[in-house]
């Protein structure tokens, strides 16, 4: 399900069963993330699918990429794999107005 930036954040903030999934590349990830996100680069192909297999399908997944296209594709793949609830962030990280975390450089 596609959600606006505000609806995505509101649902996320009130969802104890939430998992944030970033499907961008590692280079994009290094430029900043939505706090507590898990990286699973959709461009990894089979590696992306293998990592999805390790996730709990009953959780609620809040998925984002840079602009919303890859995350929409990821949500469709996840739904086909049996994930019950996925939310795509419309506009992606490029339009994100919420908190941003950066990878620890230590």
Go through the PLM ranges and name each one.
Residues 1-18, 26-60, 69-106:
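Rhodanese-like catalytic fold shared by cysteine-dependent sulfurtransferases
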């Amino acid at each position: 399900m596609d959600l606006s930036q505000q609806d995505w954040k509101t649902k996320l903030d009130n969802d104890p069963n939430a998992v944030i999934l970033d499907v961008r590349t590692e280079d994009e990830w290094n430029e900043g993330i939505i706090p507590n996100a898990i990286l699973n680069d959709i461009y990894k192909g089979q590696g992306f699918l293998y990592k999805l297999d390790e996730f709990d399908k009953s959780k609620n997944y809040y998925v984002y990429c840079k602009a919303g296209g890859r995350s929409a594709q990821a949500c469709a793949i996840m739904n086909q794999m049996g994930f019950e609830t996925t939310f795509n962030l419309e506009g992606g990280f490029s339009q994100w107005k919420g908190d941003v975390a950066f990878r620890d450089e230590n």
